[in-house]
A protein has these predicted regions:
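Ribokinase/PfkB-type carbohydrate-kinase core domain
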Residues: 1-8, 60-62, 68-71, 86-148
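Glycine-rich phosphate/adenosyl-contacting loop at the front of the ribokinase-like
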Residues: 1-66, 80
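Short beta->alpha junction loops/turns
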Residues: 47-50, 74, 124
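Short phosphate-engaging motifs
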Residues: 53, 77, 90
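Gly/Ser-rich phosphate-binding catalytic loop and adjacent alpha/beta segment
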Residues: 71-78
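Gly/Thr-rich phosphate-binding loop signature of adenosyl cofactor/nucleotide-binding cores
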Residues: 83
Length: 148
C-alpha cells in the first residue's frame, strides 16, 4: 500500500553569496529538493521579498520543477554573505530581518499541513517570532502519523 501525503521543508530559503557567485540554499528548501529528487511529492515553504532575488528564487525553483509555497512579503529575500579566510575557512554573515524571518501562516499552508507525510524544519528560521510561530503552528496542524 502506497503512503500518500507530502514531504515538506519549511523555513529558510535564501541565497548563499560566495566569492565565486551566489547559490540558492536554505536547509529546509534543500531538504524538499532532495526529497523530490528521490521521487517523493515534496514542497518547499518559506517567504520571499518583493525583489529581484525573490524573482530569481522562483525562477530557480521553476527550473528545478520544485513545488513551493513562498508568499511575497515586505522584507528582502534572505542572503548569507560567505567570506573565506587565507586558509579557505568560511565565515558567514547571515542577514537579519529578511523574508524568511517573517513567514506568514496562510490558509494554503494550513491545507498542506493537514496532508503532510513528513516535515523538516531547522532552528535558523526560528530566530524570529513570526517564522517561529508559523513553523510551530504548521507542525501542530500535521497529522498524528506525520514524521516530524
Amino acid at each position: 500500500m502506497e503512503k500518500k501525503g507530502r514531504v515538506i521543508g519549511i523555513g529558510e530559503a535564501l541565497w548563499d553569496v560566495l566569492p565565486e557567485g551566489k547559490k540558492l540554499g536554505g536547509a529546509p528548501a534543500n531538504f524538499a529538493f532532495h526529497a523530490k529528487q528521490m521521487g517523493l511529492d515534496s514542497i518547499a515553504i518559506s517567504a520571499l521579498g518583493n525583489d529581484d532575488l525573490g524573482d530569481e528564487t522562483i525562477a530557480a525553483f521553476d527550473e528545478k520543477e520544485l513545488t513551493y509555497l513562498m508568499p511575497r512579503v515586505d522584507y528582502p529575500t534572505g542572503t548569507v554573505q560567505v567570506k573565506l579566510d587565507e586558509n579557505g575557512v568560511p565565515a558567514y554573515d547571515i542577514k537579519t530581518n529578511v523574508a524568511w524571518d517573517n513567514i506568514p501562516l496562510t490558509d494554503e499552508m494550513r491545507e498542506i499541513a493537514r496532508d503532510a507525510r513528513a516535515v523538516c524544519w531547522g532552528s535558523l528560521a526560528q530566530r524570529n517570532d513570526v517564522s517561529r510561530n508559523t513553523i510551530h503552528d504548521f507542525v501542530k496542524l500535521t497529522p498524528d502519523n506525520c514524521l516530524r
